[in-house]
Every structure is written in structure tokens, then in C-alpha cells.
């Protein structure tokens, strides 16, 4: 009996990551804990949140910066405000805060033997 | 398998480079200028232009107007200069063609550019020497290019960053 | 976005894109405001304009091969207020006193600058000078001005913080004649 083991490539980075190894070994042994901590990985719901925060905050910041500079008749205020918004967004989105890791991916349990079918 | 991957990556890189090149040359065609976007290298036009500012050139005007900021290159000297037109005259050649002669001066310079021109000329020729007039301006964005070409630490730093990024993405 | 590096890349990418959009919006707003402000008719009072000439023989005064070249200098009174040109996107104003005189070649003639000034702030936009001497000794391509009539006017150039450069001229020209040779 053939048993087809199907897997979907969610993120190309995941796939190219382990191209040299057998295609299913990523599922059975993900990155060791210390390495993924340095990489600052966050789960998918967290990525969605981070994406939304950057887009909304920076767009909002652009509009506010424009109004600030235009109404105060000084373009330097636009530059400063927009830079401040950039730093704010960076400080919210770049570090892997715990609220980005609330929905971790549940991997399938490890199997002792994996049947690969060509 | 590995060689194929490398070749595909090389092909992607070639695509990116040639697209950028096409865009650059296309812009040069539209503006009729050899280098449609220039970075300000000297402080001779301060406080209007600072080093690192980006200028957008246009070269389709038949005659340059007085007060325009032009980028010109003197024959024999490879450095383009960005200065303002101080005086303009029109003369007719022996072959009945009208030439526009210009005298330029940097805002921050005490005297005009007479000493910068070619040995026998007292003026610039609009058709031969002028690369374009400055129509639009973007502040400070080009400072990165100045840092890279002039500062050896920046050069090493950039090379280091590029090497690091190629190593990390390949895992 | 799962990696720190990916988040940095994505963030800086988006930030750069929005910065460029902000520059474009500023440029468009500047163009519209220049159009609406009717900056084409700012009055300027030019009076007591006197042009004097003398002969010079050195190359730095336009002399070719030691032949005498007629050089001219100007003396003028100027009163104008360029404050309406200063908006949020104005980095500096460059003003030039230009004389335009006819030549045999072109309809609009030759244009020469006798004096220029840089105005960096709105509080200096009010220019009021009396018996001001021109900065430059001006010569023509030909050897002499031959007593031509010149129109002296004041041109300005607005340098923005971002966007297109604007050029214009004040209302208030004056006709002067070069002294007869």
C-alpha cells in the first residue's frame, strides 16, 4: 500500500531552508531551541499582527507628519515626526515580544519511521 | 542540482541589474541627458544644495534661462559641475547656427567659473557642455553614495554587510 | 515576517515606500500652492538705476588678447517684500537683478546679472536697499554695449526642501540706457 505523505510549503523560507536534507525532516526536527530564539521567530498569527501594526502605524504616521509640518509651516517637523513614528514602529514590531507568540504551530507527533513514496 | 540553482540565482541577479539599467537609460532618453539624476558632490551651491542631495535634470530646453541651475562638464575634465547661470548670450556661428553662451557661478563661490572653463573659452556652450538643467530636488538621499566612494570604512562595512547577507540567507 | 531580519527588511521597505510617497505628496501640494498663491505678481520697487561703464584690459574682465573690453557696473535702489513666497517647503530664495538688452541675433536678447542675494528666512524677505552697488562687473560678447537700452528686472528662484524648483519675476521693471560710447 502506498501512503502518500502530503505536506504544504507555508513559507518558501521554510522550504529552501532544508533543501539539502530529506523533505520531511523539517517536520520531524525543527530548528533547535537556541537558534530559533536568536532568529526571533514568531508564529503566524503574530506575523499577521506585526504586519498590520507596521502598515497602519506607518501610514497613520505619514498622514500626521504631513499635517504637523504643513500646519506649523515647518517641514523639519514632518521629518522629525515621521522619524519618530518609524522608531516607534520598529520598537513595537522588530523585537519578538511574547504577544506575537500566543498561537504557536502544533506540529504532528514524531514518528519512528517515515514512509517516503516516490 | 546545485549548479542549476546557482545559475537561476545568477539569472535573477542579471534580470534585476538589466531592469535597473533599462530604467536608467530610458530616463536618459526621456530627459535627453546622459546622466538624468546626479548627486551633489561639492558645497559650491550652498545653502541651496548640500553634499549628498539628488538633482533631477532636464535637457530638452533649446535655450537655458538666466538663473537656471545647470550641470555642465568642461571638455577634457571629467567632473560635472552644478552651478547657476549668471549671464547668457546668443551668437551666430559662421555656419549661421545660433549658439547660446553661458557664464556660470556657484552660489557659494566668490567669483564666476571663468577659471574652470576650457583654456581658450570665456563661456560655456549650451549644446556642447551643458548636461541638463536642474528641475527637481531631493535632499540628502544620495549621501550614501558619497560615503561609499569616499570613506574606506563605509566601503568595507558595505562589503561586509553584503557578504554577511549572502552567507546568512543561504544558511 | 517570521524572522527578525525579515521583519527589519519588511519594515524598512514599507517605510521607504511611504517616505517616497510623502515626498511626492509634498511636491504636488507645493505645485498647487504656488499656483494658488498667485506668486507671479509680487511687486518690487526698482528706482534710481544707473549703469556706468569703463574699459578693462585683463582676461578676468573679459578682455580677449589685450583688446579693451567695455565693462559695466550698476547702482540701484530696491524695495520689495518676498514674504508671500515663503511656505513650509521653501528652503531658500535666490534673487537676481537682471538686465536684458537687445542683440542682433535673438528676439529676447542677452541677459546679464548685476547683483544677486540669498534669502534663507521669512524675516529677511523684506529687501530695502539704497544706492546698492552691483556685485559684478559685466561685459558683453561684443567689445562694447554701444549705448543700448536695457530692461532691468528682479528675478527670483525658490529652492524647495523637496520637489520642483520654481522661478519667477517680480512686477516692476525699469528701462535704463547704457552710456553712449
Swiss-Prot record, chain B:
Taxonomic placement: Eukaryota, Fungi, Dikarya, Ascomycota, Saccharomycotina
How would you summarize the oligomeric state and partners of this protein?
Answer: Component of the signal peptidase complex (SPC) composed of a catalytic subunit SEC11 and three accessory subunits SPC1, SPC2 and SPC3. The complex induces a local thinning of the ER membrane which is used to measure the length of the signal peptide (SP) h-region of protein substrates. This ensures the selectivity of the complex towards h-regions shorter than 18-20 amino acids. SPC associates with the translocon complex.
- EC number(s) given by UniProt: 3.4.21.89
Q: Which domain of life is it from?
A: Eukaryota
Q: From the Swiss-Prot or TrEMBL record, give the protein name.
A: Signal peptidase complex catalytic subunit SEC11
Listed under GO biological process in this entry are:
signal peptide processing
Q: What InterPro entries does this protein map onto? A: LexA/Signal_pep-like_sf (IPR036286), Pept_S26A_signal_pept_1_CS (IPR019758), Pept_S26A_signal_pept_1_Ser-AS (IPR019756), Peptidase_S26 (IPR019533), Peptidase_S26B (IPR001733)
List the membrane topology term(s): Single-pass type II membrane protein
Q: What does this protein do?
A: Catalytic component of the signal peptidase complex (SPC) which catalyzes the cleavage of N-terminal signal sequences from nascent proteins as they are translocated into the lumen of the endoplasmic reticulum. Specifically cleaves N-terminal signal peptides that contain a hydrophobic alpha-helix (h-region) shorter than 18-20 amino acids.
| Cellular compartments annotated | Endoplasmic reticulum membrane
**Catalytic activity line of the entry:** Cleavage of hydrophobic, N-terminal signal or leader sequences from secreted and periplasmic proteins
Write out the domain note: The C-terminal short (CTS) helix is essential for catalytic activity. It may be accommodated as a transmembrane helix in the thinned membrane environment of the complex, similarly to the signal peptide in the complex substrates.
Question: Recorded GO terms, molecular function?
Answer: serine-type endopeptidase activity
Q: Does the keyword Endoplasmic reticulum apply?
A: yes
Which source organism does the UniProt entry give?
Answer: Komagataella phaffii (strain GS115 / ATCC 20864)
Cite the ranges annotated as topological domain Lumenal: 25-171
Task: List the ranges whose topology is Cytoplasmic.
Answer: 1-6
The residues responsible for catalysis, as annotated, are 44 (charge relay system), 83 (charge relay system), 113 (charge relay system)
User: What start and end residues bound the annotated signal peptide?
Assistant: none
Record's keyword annotation contains Transmembrane helix? yes
What does the UniProt keyword field contain?
Answer: Endoplasmic reticulum, Hydrolase, Membrane, Protease, Signal-anchor, Transmembrane, Transmembrane helix
What family does this chain come from, according to its entry? Belongs to the peptidase S26B family.
Catalytic EC class: hydrolase
> What's a single GO CC term here?
signal peptidase complex
Membrane-spanning parts: 7-24
State the residue spans of region: C-terminal short (CTS) helix: 157-168
